[in-house]
A protein has these predicted regions:
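Substrate-binding groove of N-acetylhexosamine-processing glycoside hydrolases
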Residues: 1-4, 16-25, 64-67, 73, ...
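Conserved, charge-rich beta-strand/loop surface module that forms ligand/interface-binding patches
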Residues: 1-13, 32
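Aromatic- and acidic-residue-enriched carbohydrate-binding clefts of CAZyme catalytic domains
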Residues: 2, 26-29, 34-75, 84-119, ...
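Generic enzyme active-site microenvironment
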Residues: 7, 79, 141
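Generic anion/oxyanion-binding catalytic loop in active/binding sites
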Residues: 9, 110, 331
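Short, flexible active-site loop motifs that bind/organize anionic cofactors or intermediates
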Residues: 10, 52, 242-245
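Generic alpha-helical scaffold signal
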Residues: 14, 21, 56-59
Length: 467
């Protein structure tokens, strides 16, 4: 397989530019020869008038990142969305007129009938190519386009506009003697024969993160087209801090079997998703994904892994200098963080290598432990709401759950303060604060609601007992 890549989703929670260099080292050591970088609002595009995230890297930091990738023989593949996933631009008043459906339309994708949208995309592409000289492959995105958004400017045939725009973007990049990659799903959903309308040499990347469509894959293999595949090595569940691992291993296993059947697939991307678009809550991708990236690399190199426990132990000894507790890691991460606590604490305290990832896993598991306790308290209070309101709960029960309210508040604040210095070694402070805010601000406000409900319940019980 020519290209073995990991996806770096920068629209979500990013590491510091300095720490990211060490991640490139590890990916190269694992056997990857490419990194697909999806920048969005973390790149300071001049073309978008400086409207970027406060934690965006500088162009100089990106140049350093690109140079480091080159030193490690890791091909940096820029990904610049050409159709949708554009809310990082279109959410701003300055660009509202470019929205599909007009100024009051969606901020998700732009209007393909407007020449301005093509010109803006080209200007942004030029900035990326200037910062990353020597780029050989460029990904133009083009996935998940909504063909049903009413737009007077577009008319009714959005698919035709879509294909024309994708073709123009591909031709623009090809004229610079670069290979062009795009996501395949719009063509998959509207007729794969339409790939023939694209310029020769454009490479579809077939992404399937749950069930694989084997009939479609067989047709793609028989078509003679060069294509890549894409698995999902990380995606979070209900905004947990740690991602579940086992479903991602199943996806990688399925793709491993496909690669054995169709060895002509010329590239693969292990995607690590932080969020759908930049207005959604953030999740963690790299560096948290390092176990699954190793699992993917082993699969791409040697085929489907048949003994996961053996692989986990070998990974642990090589990466951390100690064996991993497979059952604790894969049964408890995300789902039972309190049970995972002993495992990640031992890892943090005893790892002789890559203590950074051990600390990151520990810190995010601590977040999940806090959330687990809050969810337990809230679930009980929600189930008891009628009883609380009626004032029919005994005082000892109300006191117990009022103590839960206190702990939700005090333990959360103390826990966050305790782990923050450790996490700021790897993540920008504003990024960490945004992550914490999205998980706890609303919950602590809800906690005050339960304080009010339970205080009233205690007063009603006291009054009831007087009668």
């Amino acid at each position: 397989m020519e290209i073995k890549a990991v996806h770096f989703d920068m629209k979500s929670m990013i590491p510091t530019a300095d720490y990211a260099l060490t991640l490139v080292d590890e990916l190269a050591e694992q056997g990857f020869n490419a990194i697909l970088v999806e920048f969005e609002d973390k790149f300071p595009f001049d073309a978008t008038a400086g409207l970027h995230h406060p934690c965006a890297w500088t162009k100089e930091e990106f140049r350093r990142f690109g140079a480091h990738c080159k030193e490690k023989n890791v091909e940096l593949i820029p990904l610049l969305q050409s159709i949708g996933h554009l809310d990082y631009i279109l959410k701003y008043p300055k660009f509202r007129d470019l929205r599909d459906g007009g100024p009051g339309g969606t901020s998700y994708q732009w209007c393909l009938a407007l020449e301005e949208t093509y010109e803006l995309w080209c200007a942004m592409a030029e900035e990326l190519l200037e910062v990353f000289p020597g780029t050989k492959i460029f990904h133009i995105g083009a996935d998940e386009c909504n063909m049903r958004i009413p737009c007077e400017r577009c008319g009714s045939d959005k698919l035709d506009l879509y294909i024309k725009r994708v073709r123009r973007c591909a031709e623009y990049i090809q004229k610079k003697n670069l290979k062009v990659v795009l996501w395949d799903d719009v063509f998959r959903n509207h007729g794969a024969e339409k790939f023939a309308e694209l310029p020769k040499g454009v490479i579809p990347c077939v992404w399937m993160y749950r069930e694989l469509d084997y009939d479609y894959l067989e047709r793609m293999a028989a078509s003679g087209l060069e294509f890549w595949s894409a698995s999902c090595i990380q995606a979070h569940r209900f905004y947990s801090a740690m991602a579940p691992q086992e479903p991602k291993m199943r996806n990688v296993d399925a793709w491993g079997a496909v690669h054995a059947k169709y060895p002509r697939i010329s590239g693969h991307v292990g995607t690590a998703w932080g969020r759908i678009q930049c207005q959604s809550p953030i999740d963690v991708t790299l560096p948290q994904s390092m176990f699954m990236s190793a699992y993917l690399s082993e699969t791409l190199t040697k085929g489907v892994i048949t003994d996961r426990k053996k692989f986990a132990n070998e990974f642990g000894k090589k990466f951390f200098g100690m064996e991993l507790d497979y059952d604790a890691m894969f049964s408890y991460f995300c789902y039972e963080p309190t049970c995972a606590g002993k495992f990640v604490t031992e890892l943090k305290d005893n790892a002789s290598r890559h203590r950074d990832l051990a600390e990151i896993w520990y810190g995010f598991n601590e977040i999940d432990k806090m959330l687990e306790y809050i969810y337990t308290c809230f679930a009980n209070n929600e189930a008891m709401l009628t009883t609380w309101r009626a004032g029919m709960a005994p005082n000892e029960m109300t006191s117990n759950w009022l103590d839960g309210v206190r702990r939700c508040y005090e333990d959360t604040l103390a826990g966050l303060e305790r782990i923050k210095p450790m996490m700021l070694k790897y993540f920008p402070e504003k990024m960490w604060d945004e992550f914490v805010d999205q998980r706890f601000t609303a919950k602590l406000e809800q906690n005050e609601y339960w304080r009010h409900v339970l205080t009233n319940a205690a007063a009603k019980w006291k009054e009831y007992m007087r009668k």
